[in-house]
Amino acid sequence: MVEAKIKALRDELERHNYNYYVLSAPTISDFEFDKMMKELQELEAAHPEFADPDSPTRRVGSDLSKEFEQVVHKYPMLSLGNTYSEDEIRDFYDRTVRSLNEPFEIVAELKYDGTSISLTYEKGRLTRAVTRGDGTRGDDVTANIKTIRSVPLRLRGSDFPEEFEIRGEVLLPWAEFDRLNKEREEQEEPLFANPRNAASGTLKQQNPAIVASRKLDAYFYYLLGENLPAEGHYENLQAARAWGFKIPDVIRKCQSLQDIFDYIAYWDVERKNLPVATDGIVLKVNSLRQQRNLGFTSKSPRWAIAYKFQAERAETRLNSVSFQVGRTGTVTPVANLEPVLLAGTVVKRASLHNADIIEGLDLHIGDQVYVEKGGEIIPKIVGVNVEARSMLMGDKVRFIRVCPECGTPLVRPEGEAAHYCPNESGCPPQIKGRIEHFVTRKAMNINIGPETVEDLYNAGYVKDSADLYTLTVADLLRLERWAEKSAQNLMSSLEESKQVPFERVLFGLGIRFVGETVAKRLVSAFHSIEALEQASLEDLVAVDEIGERIAQSVLSYFSDEKNRTLVNRLKEQGLRMAVSEEQLANRSEKLKGLTIVISGTFSKHSRDEYKAMIEQHGGKNSGSVSGKTDYILAGENMGPAKLEKAAKLGVKIINEDAFLNMLE
């Protein structure tokens, strides 16, 4: 009875996974899905004799991998020959005509810009996932791949081969890339340069739980093995779609060279509207027999070629390199350029990321450099026009050894790309940066900006965030541009900030890796600053979404006596360092598992108040309507786009009264 129930839950959850992640057509809410998942987890925990490595519960990525085993590819993962030239596409087509001397079809596909993967299935079950590596051998990343919801652990139907491989691309969607970089920016971690690097780095994470949290996707494009269902590559992909694989629906058969050029021209424009990064078109001879006849060179197949889209690039002069220090001490090199037009905007600066990038480019001041804007959020230098160098070559660019602001020797933690200034208490940009972070709207919401922080710091009035609360009107009036009214306004703003809830105070402290969401998780678990200070590593990592890196950062922060003193001074000034009795009493799980979008203007409460209520009762706020949305809380003047999307997806729209009734 129990075994049958477990099997039924597994089958149903896999069906819903397929509907959501492959078909993009969910049939149940996240709440219902999570409820089923929890039931299955509890049954599996109570009955380990029915364990199954392919269970949907394994997708959450709970196992910690110590290392990746090297695996030899059964079929080498060769690179494709590539070109940026339509003339070379024409040459490829003409060579194929001459070599085959019979009719043939070309299959045109988008070239996805991620990290390549090869999956092995035996009797319909995923048994191994291996990265490209050097083409001959790669890393076994099966545990990480199993966390990707669009990868089938068991195949649908029964007409698949006994054993086969399928090749594909692991991708980080643009929306997830933006979310991840925003989170890293808030925590002053180095940003991912593009979704490809982010996907590759994620897949190599030692902890599958981190992989699961980043919402990777996977598209598949080639099958290998004995007894494939068809003699055509295109037809095999359609069969794989029926087995549960995510096969792009933009694949086309081309009967002529003009068909190919039309496909390239269309997607060179339209690819910008896709949810994932692409960097070209792949062309393959459709017939597997003809592929075998054409064969391979030592490096690539003769029956396929990749056409690469031109990246948006410009050439300009490198005038200088400056180094910026962030609030957590991260030192970032920035190239200062002769202004140049690129992708419709004038570019004056470009990212150099870290010391390894600088060394790899072998930059010299005065070099003519190539600046590119592809999938990146800011322009980057991708190369140097060495031929343009004169005999009077400028100084070689080297990463600095000491902090440009305070002169402290920089450190580079083992395994990290970034350099840091360790002088947290004496480095001006770090001090001012922490204060600027503390006063932001999402933290303490104190009505001053960077210029005022700069003035207060230079005048000697403020050396840390606690000093803000000892300011007087007389202090402010001694500064330029300050009058009685503006000084009183700041005093009022400081007083009002003492009512800011604990999670925002914790976020405002600027602990490395503790963003808004992490701060809320910690406050929900520990309720007071004292409890958080006394928490052990084991206590911290037991909190949902808190990994060892965040836990170590929290422990490091509170082990520093200066930080504990700062917290005590803020507490003495009246800031909230604990969840109030009222907040604890009002918490519930009435909205647990529900995702709610707020739209429009309201009369009974503000939007921020409604957001707080949703979180207080266990719900989740979202800024956009999707298949995961359970309700839209709608006020006056709700956006027409959200209204249209809600109608299309069948999302229920509720007003203020209906929402408040849900909380009673």
UniProtKB/Swiss-Prot annotation:
Entry GO MF terms: DNA ligase (NAD+) activity; metal ion binding
Needed cofactors, names only, are:
Mg(2+); Mn(2+)
Q: Alphabetically list the UniProt keywords.
A: DNA damage, DNA repair, DNA replication, Ligase, Magnesium, Manganese, Metal-binding, NAD, Zinc
Question: Which reactions does this protein catalyse?
Answer: NAD(+) + (deoxyribonucleotide)n-3'-hydroxyl + 5'-phospho-(deoxyribonucleotide)m = (deoxyribonucleotide)n+m + AMP + beta-nicotinamide D-nucleotide
Q: Which PROSITE patterns match?
A: BRCT, DNA_LIGASE_N2
Sites where the protein binds Zn(2+):
C403, C406, C421, C427
Q: What is its EC number?
A: 6.5.1.2
Catalytic site positions: K111
Q: Where is the BRCT domain?
A: 586-664
**GO CC annotations, alphabetized:** cytosol
One record GO biological process: DNA repair
NCBIfam families (UniProt xref): dnlj, PRK07956.1
The record's similarity note reads: Belongs to the NAD-dependent DNA ligase family. LigA subfamily.
UniProt function note = DNA ligase that catalyzes the formation of phosphodiester linkages between 5'-phosphoryl and 3'-hydroxyl groups in double-stranded DNA using NAD as a coenzyme and as the energy source for the reaction. It is essential for DNA replication and repair of damaged DNA.
Name the chain's protein: DNA ligase
